Amino acid sequence: WAHALAGLDARAVVLAAAFDRSPAPVAALLRLARERGATSVLLTNRRVGPLPPLADVLLVTPAASQDAMFRTRVGTLVVLEALLDSVAAVHPELRRAAAVEEVFTALGGYITC
């Protein structure tokens, strides 16, 4: 994602998501957004930790029970899908999912590095 972030500026909104842990790449992304003047939104199930202070907007989707052995990510995924659908509805010119799927189909699958 270095290529996509190279032009990051104050007009951008960065959406980051983290569940249970605080991955270093997410922290780096939030710091980069702040340095470039972009607005950052963090979607997470934790109100405290190293990531929330780095975000301009914090969206918390707590698990049903923090004590459960297997916590669900359903709430986080629902909010993420709602945000992406809302952006696509307001800015149809930013829709890329169909184009990405066309590339995957043309290449015969996903390419990983």
Model-derived features: where do they sit?
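Internal, active-site/partner-interface "lid" segment
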Residues: 90-113
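Glycine-rich phosphate-binding loops that contact phosphosugars or nucleotide phosphates
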Residues: 1-90
